[in-house]
Design a protein with these regions (language model features):
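Extreme N-terminal leader/targeting segments of oxidoreductases
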Residues: 1-8, 27, 396, 401
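N-terminal Rossmann-like FAD-binding beta1-loop-alpha1 element of flavoenzymes
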Residues: 7-33
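Active-site substrate-recognition segment that forms the wall
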Residues: 20-28, 37, 49-50, 92-97, ...
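Helix-loop-beta segment of a Rossmann-like dinucleotide-binding subdomain
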Residues: 90-106, 128-182, 287-291, 350-351
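A conserved short coil-to-beta-strand element within the FAD-binding core of flavoproteins
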Residues: 188-210
Length: 404
C-alpha cells in the first residue's frame, strides 16, 4: 500500500468545526485533507443559529464556561472579514447578522427570576466584560416586545440584549470550505485543501496516523477528529472516560405572509423554545430527544415544537410551513465539550451540544493549531478529552432553549 497521498493534517468531519479547522490550517501553510461522509442529521446544517454570549442555562455562571462562550462569540468578528475577503460572492448579512436578542418571560415567577439573574449579571462593567456584552440590557414591556414581534402573546416582559447575532450554519460552513480552497489556490507554497468524500476510519495500530476512506489510505502528520455526534470508526481505542451521545433536535421553519423578518431580534425563553427571523422565514425550535442516530422528522417532534411556538407566539398560526430540519447534537456525558489531544498525532473536538454554531469556529481553529504544533490556550484546559468526568451540565427536555 505505498504511494498513499500525504498531508500535514487530515480533518475528519466537514461541519462547522472541521470547516473552520480547514481554513485555519491552510492559512498556516498546511496541506489539508478534509474527509466527510455527509451523513443525515449533521447538526451544523440544521442548527437554528443563535450566536449569543449570554447563556440561559447549562452552568452559565461558571467563569471558565462563560469565558469560552465569550471568546468564541468574539471570534466571529475576526473570522467573518476573512471569509468575506476570500469568498466575496457570499459576503453580506445573509450568512451572519447582529440582530440582538429578546429574552422573554410570562408572569411565571421562576421565568422572571431567570431574567432578573441575567440582568444582575450584566448590570456592572465587570459582568458585561466577562460576557463580552458592550451595553447593559434594556428592560422591555409587552408593547415594546410586540413592536419587534407582533405575533407574540401580549403578557410578556423581558430584556433586550444587543450583542447577539444569528447565523445560517450551512451557509457559513460552505463558505469556510470555499475560503480554504481559495486560500490554497491563491497562496500555494505547499498549502491547500483536498475535500475527500466518504466515511473515514482511523488506522488501528496507534502508531501511524493513517486514515482509510473506503479502500484508499491517506497519510498525515496529524489527524483532527471533528465528527460531531458520530464516533470516528477506530476512535474506540482512545478509551476516554467521557462518552458522547447524539441528541436529536427538530427545528421547524415557517413563512409569514408579509415576510420581511430578517432584521427581527432573536426571541429566547427559559423553557418555551425560541424564534429567529431570517430574510425568508421564521425558525422555531427545538426538540431535545435521546433517540440515538434516528434523524427522522416525526409527527410528535413537529407537534411539540409548534405547540410551544404557538403558545409563545399565537400570531404564527397563519404562517405557512416551509420545512423541518433535524440535527443530531453531540452531547457529552458531563455536558461540556471535548477539545484536545487524545493520542499521539490525534486530536478531537466534539460534545458541543446545542452550542455548535457558537463555539465551533474558534474551537476548530484552536484544535487544529494545537495539532500542527501550537499550544492550546490554558483557558481550555478544563475541556480536555482526558479529564475526569464532571457532574452533568445539561439534561434532557422536550423543548430545548439556549444557543441551538
Amino acid at each position: 500500500m505505498s504511494g498513499a497521498p500525504t498531508y500535514d493534517v487530515i480533518i475528519i468531519g466537514a461541519g462547522i468545526v472541521g470547516a473552520s479547522a480547514a481554513l485555519a490550517a491552510v492559512r498556516m501553510g498546511a496541506k489539508v485533507a478534509l474527509v466527510d461522509a455527509r451523513l443525515a442529521g449533521r447538526a451544523s446544517d440544521a442548527g437554528a443559529g443563535i450566536v449569543s454570549p449570554v447563556a440561559l442555562d447549562r452552568g452559565e455562571a461558571r467563569p471558565a464556561w462563560t469565558s469560552v462562550i465569550t471568546r468564541c462569540v468574539d471570534h466571529y468578528r475576526k473570522l467573518l472579514p476573512i471569509v468575506d475577503a476570500l469568498d466575496p460572492a457570499g459576503a453580506g448579512s445573509a450568512t451572519f447578522r447582529q440582530v440582538g436578542e429578546l429574552v422573554v418571560a410570562r408572569s411565571d415567577r421562576e421565568e422572571q427570576a431567570t431574567i432578573a439573574a441575567i440582568r444582575d449579571r450584566l448590570s456592572t462593567e465587570t459582568g458585561r466584560q466577562a460576557h463580552g456584552v458592550s451595553v447593559s440590557p434594556t428592560d422591555v414591556d409587552a408593547s415594546e416586545i410586540r413592536k419587534y414581534w407582533p405575533e407574540l402573546r401580549e403578557d410578556l416582559v423581558g430584556l433586550f440584549i444587543a450583542d447577539v447575532g444569528r447565523v445560517v450554519g450551512s451557509r457559513l460552513t460552505d463558505r469556510l470550505i470555499t475560503s480554504a480552497a481559495r486560500w490554497g489556490q491563491d497562496h500555494g507554497q505547499g498549502s491547500g485543501l483536498t475535500v475527500v468524500p466518504g466515511l473515514a476510519r482511523l488506522g488501528s495500530d496507534r502508531v501511524t496516523t493513517d486514515v482509510w476512506v473506503g479502500h484508499d489510505r491517506l497519510s498525515a502528520g496529524t489527524v483532527l477528529v471533528a465528527t460531531g455526534a458520530w464516533p470516528a470508526p477506530g476512535s474506540e481505542m482512545f478509551g476516554l472516560g467521557i462518552s458522547v451521545r447524539p441528541v436529536r433536535g427538530q427545528i421547524v421553519h415557517l413563512r409569514l405572509p408579509n415576510g420581511a423578518t430578517g432584521d427581527r431580534p432573536v426571541v429566547n425563553t427559559t423553557g418555551a423554545g425560541y424564534l429567529l427571523g431570517f430574510d425568508d422565514r421564521v425558525v422555531v425550535g427545538a426538540t431535545h430527544e435521546d433517540v440515538g442516530f434516528d434523524a427522522r422528522v416525526t409527527a410528535g417532534g413537529q407537534h411539540a415544537v409548534l405547540a410551544a411556538a404557538l403558545e409563545l407566539a399565537p400570531g404564527l398560526a397563519g404562517a405557512g410551513f416551509v420545512e423541518t430540519r433535524v440535527g443530531l447534537r453531540p452531547v457529552s456525558s458531563d455536558g461540556l465539550p471535548l477539545v484536545g489531544v487524545v493520542a499521539p498525532g490525534i486530536s478531537l473536538v466534539t460534545g458541543l451540544g446545542a452550542w455548535g454554531l457558537t463555539l465551533g469556529p474558534l474551537l476548530g481553529q484552536l484544535a487544529v493549531e494545537e495539532a500542527l504544533g501550537h499550544r492550546l490556550p490554558d483557558w481550555l484546559n478544563f475541556l480536555s478529552p482526558t479529564r475526569t468526568p464532571a457532574v452533568a451540565h445539561e439534561t434532557s427536555a422536550t423543548i430545548h432553549t439556549g444557543a441551538a
